[in-house]
């Protein structure tokens, strides 16, 4: 994930900062506990495409 892109992307639901989870190819919003998929290096920032994440995934290694 391009660090500059990560700086400007925010959660579409709460406008919070996102965390890049490289192993899962997802951008995670710790505030909403939603994970947005990254497909072919393109973040899919649609709430209907996000999945709920458990508390262990928010700041964990996922």
From Swiss-Prot:
Q: Which GO terms describe its cellular component?
A: cytosol
InterPro entries linked: Trm112-like
Q: Which domain of life is it from?
A: Bacteria
Q: Which Pfam family would be a valid example here?
A: Trm112p
Q: Which family does it belong to?
A: Belongs to the UPF0434 family.
Protein name (database record): UPF0434 protein Tbd_1506
Q: Which organism is it from?
A: Thiobacillus denitrificans (strain ATCC 25259 / T1)
């Amino acid at each position: 994930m391009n660090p500059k892109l990560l700086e400007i992307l925010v959660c579409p639901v709460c406008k919070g900062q996102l965390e890049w989870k490289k192993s899962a190819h997802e951008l995670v919003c710790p505030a909403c506990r939603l994970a947005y998929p990254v497909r072919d290096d393109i973040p899919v920032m649609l709430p209907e495409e996000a999945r709920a994440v458990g508390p262990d995934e928010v700041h964990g290694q996922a």
